[in-house]
């Protein structure tokens, strides 16, 4: 059975190989690059794949990044090995999953916000089902000092509403011209998160009160 990772923390920074096996060379691989970002569905609570940064050609010419589907690779001896199948990478992967790559979102570092406008921190590690990509939970970070005092909170998947445009921080968008009004985005969570935090003994009411913004 194919093995795949189940958290963004396990994937980002990993070296990636491309399967180049043939009947005569069943273990042949080629270096592809290193995982730069994890990518999520624009409207669903789902991990769809990751972006691999390729090494520059002759240390001078930048090569295009490669998008790999969440199910387009196996973990072999601790290394990510990307399948040769056309639906494993690029446009083929997006077509197979029914997503538009330019609409997809990078969750890492986005603010985590309640429906009432409370900002709980930013997205840290995200856990998901390796077989489907469905998000199981995410951790919220408030910076090293706050994390040391309060601990890193985990928000279960059923309380995560998903990505929401128009609130939060400015996004990096493909094709956006300089001078255009920035597009904002955040990860929206249920207001039940505040109660969950108090029950877990990691109440951060003071932090939340100073980080409440209008949702209008």
What are these regions (language model features)?
Residues 1-216:
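Peripheral interaction segments used for macromolecular assembly
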């Amino acid at each position: 059975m194919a093995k795949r990772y189940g958290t963004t923390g396990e994937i980002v920074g990993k070296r990636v190989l491309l399967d180049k096996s043939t009947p005569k060379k069943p273990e042949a691989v080629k270096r592809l690059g290193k995982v730069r970002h994890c990518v999520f569905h624009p409207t669903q609570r789902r991990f769809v794949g990751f972006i691999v940064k390729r090494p520059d050609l002759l240390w001078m010419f930048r090569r295009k990044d490669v998008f790999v589907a969440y199910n387009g690779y196996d973990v072999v001896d601790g290394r990510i090995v990307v399948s040769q199948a056309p639906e494993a990478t690029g446009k083929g992967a997006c077509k197979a999953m029914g997503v538009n790559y330019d609409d997809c979102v990078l969750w890492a570092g986005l603010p985590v916000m309640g429906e009432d406008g409370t900002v709980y921190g930013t997205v840290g590690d995200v856990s998901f089902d390796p077989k489907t990509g469905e998000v199981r939970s995410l951790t919220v970070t408030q910076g090293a000092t706050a994390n040391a005092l309060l601990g890193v909170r985990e928000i279960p998947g059923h309380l995560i509403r998903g990505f929401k445009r128009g609130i939060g921080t400015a996004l990096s968008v493909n094709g956006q011209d300089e001078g255009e009004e920035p597009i904002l985005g955040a990860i929206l969570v249920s207001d039940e998160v505040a109660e969950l935090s108090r029950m877990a003994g990691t109440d951060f009411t003071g932090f939340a009160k100073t980080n409440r913004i209008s949702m209008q």
